[in-house]
From Swiss-Prot:
Biased composition (Basic residues): 1-22, 30-44
UniProt superkingdom: Bacteria
Keywords: Ribonucleoprotein, Ribosomal protein
Family to which the UniProt record says this protein belongs: Belongs to the bacterial ribosomal protein bL34 family.
Pfam families per UniProt: Ribosomal_L34 (PF00468)
Native organism: Limosilactobacillus reuteri (strain DSM 20016) (Lactobacillus reuteri)
PANTHER family: LARGE RIBOSOMAL SUBUNIT PROTEIN BL34M (PTHR14503:SF4), MITOCHONDRIAL RIBOSOMAL PROTEIN 34 FAMILY MEMBER (PTHR14503)
GO BP annotation list: translation
A single Gene Ontology CC term: ribonucleoprotein complex
Name under which the protein is recorded: Large ribosomal subunit protein bL34
Phylogenetic classification of the source organism: Bacteria, Bacillati, Bacillota, Bacilli, Lactobacillales
């Protein structure tokens, strides 16, 4: 059986990256919450 996680840098960035988060209002809310919480890394 193959593993379900087959990492790809481009896919990770495009789906969960900073620019993707900034492109929608809800994504910006995600970043705001993570800033408020004090996350060192905001997005992938």
């Amino acid at each position: 059986m193959k593993r379900t996680f087959q990492p790809k840098k481009r896919h990770r960035a495009r789906v969960h990256g900073f620019r993707k988060r900034m492109s929608t209002s809800n994504g910006r809310k995600v970043l705001a919450r993570r800033r408020q919480k004090g996350r060192k890394v905001l997005s992938a």
